[in-house]
Structures are given as C-alpha cells and as structure tokens.
Amino acid sequence: MSYMLPHLHNGWQVDQAILSEEDRVVVIRFGHDWDPTCMKMDEVLYSIAEKVKNFAVIYLVDITEVPDFNKMYELYDPCTVMFFFRNKHIMIDLGTGNNNKINWAMEDKQEMVDIIETVYRGARKGRGLVVSPKDYSTKYRY
C-alpha cells in the first residue's frame, strides 16, 4: 500500500513537509517499502488517511534513500512512525519507555486514529509530550 501514500525523496522535502503544515499533525513513517513491518504499518496508515485528513497528513520516507535523519532521530528500527506539529517533534508516551516514536507495526486502525487524534489535541494545546490513550507496555507479553 505504500505506493498510495505520498513519499518524500530527500531531506529538503521532509523539512518542507514539516515546516509548511500549519494546522495539521505531520505523520512520517520512516523505513523501507519492502519491509514486512512497514508494509503492515503502511496498510493501516493508508486505510486511515482519509479519516484523519482534517487533522493529520501522512508521508513515507525511505531511510536508505534519505539517510539525513537516521542519526538525528535514531532510526535504527525497520519501521518508525514520528509526529510533528508546527515544526516541532511531538513525543508520545506509549508506556514503552521510548517517547520519541512508534517503532512497531500498529495492527488496529482505530488505535492509530486515536493516537494521531491525541497527538493533535495535545500539540494544539502546546504540549511537546502527549500520553497515549492506550498503554503499550505489555504488548509483547500477551
């Protein structure tokens, strides 16, 4: 599904996407289109893109094609989703200890919509860190 979502092909395009969006959250999936984890995540992102279009815009970035942010954002996972609002990285507390990003494939579409909505609401209030509506600290346990 990655071909259906807009790709950013260089660091300048990524910066412009983050800078130019005034009223919506910029959701960027860093990873590879061929990676199974990314494919799962892309399918979820594509399926919710229409639902969240009023408060979020979704982009994909290939970390091999655009290595500019790999060190800065510690993009070592096969699939990483990050949130930005008005040129500011919005952190999200998912209960996993890593508040910078989502580094696994979300399988539940509604959960992803809820997270993006929570990020949007918190960011509009000026918060740099928002708390996820669901705690993912036990996601690997059960």
From Swiss-Prot:
Cystine pairs: C38-C79
Cell division found in the keyword field: yes
GO cellular component terms listed in the entry, alphabetical order: cytosol; nucleoplasm; nucleus; spliceosomal complex; U2-type precatalytic spliceosome; U4/U6 x U5 tri-snRNP complex; U5 snRNP
InterPro entries reported for this sequence: Dim1 (IPR004123), Thioredoxin-like_sf (IPR036249)
Places the protein is found: Nucleus
Keyword Phosphoprotein: yes
Sites of Phosphoserine modification: S132
PTM info: The disulfide bond seen in structures determined by X-ray crystallography and NMR is not essential for protein folding and function.
CDD domains: DIM1
Domain of life of the organism encoding this protein: Eukaryota
Keywords: Cell cycle, Cell division, Deafness, Disulfide bond, Mitosis, mRNA processing, mRNA splicing, Nucleus, Phosphoprotein, Spliceosome
Biological process terms in GO annotation: cell division; mRNA splicing, via spliceosome; RNA splicing, via transesterification reactions; spliceosomal complex assembly
Similarity comment text for this entry: Belongs to the DIM1 family.
Function: Plays a role in pre-mRNA splicing as component of the U5 snRNP and U4/U6-U5 tri-snRNP complexes that are involved in spliceosome assembly, and as component of the precatalytic spliceosome (spliceosome B complex).
Subunit structure of this chain's protein: Component of the precatalytic spliceosome (spliceosome B complex). Component of the U5 snRNP complex. Component of the U4/U6-U5 tri-snRNP complex. The U4/U6-U5 tri-snRNP complex is a building block of the precatalytic spliceosome (spliceosome B complex). The U4/U6-U5 tri-snRNP complex is composed of the U4, U6 and U5 snRNAs and at least PRPF3, PRPF4, PRPF6, PRPF8, PRPF31, SNRNP200, TXNL4A, SNRNP40, SNRPB, SNRPD1, SNRPD2, SNRPD3, SNRPE, SNRPF, SNRPG, DDX23, CD2BP2, PPIH, SNU13, EFTUD2, SART1 and USP39, plus LSM2, LSM3, LSM4, LSM5, LSM6, LSM7 and LSM8. Directly interacts with CD2BP2.
Disease: Burn-McKeown syndrome: A disease characterized by choanal atresia, sensorineural deafness, cardiac defects, and typical craniofacial dysmorphism consisting of narrow palpebral fissures, coloboma of the lower eyelids, prominent nose with high nasal bridge, short philtrum, cleft lip and/or palate, and large and protruding ears. Intellectual development is normal.
Xref: PANTHER family: THIOREDOXIN-LIKE PROTEIN 4A, THIOREDOXIN-LIKE PROTEN 4A, 4B
Protein name: Thioredoxin-like protein 4A
Organism: Homo sapiens (Human)
Lineage: Eukaryota, Metazoa, Chordata, Craniata, Vertebrata
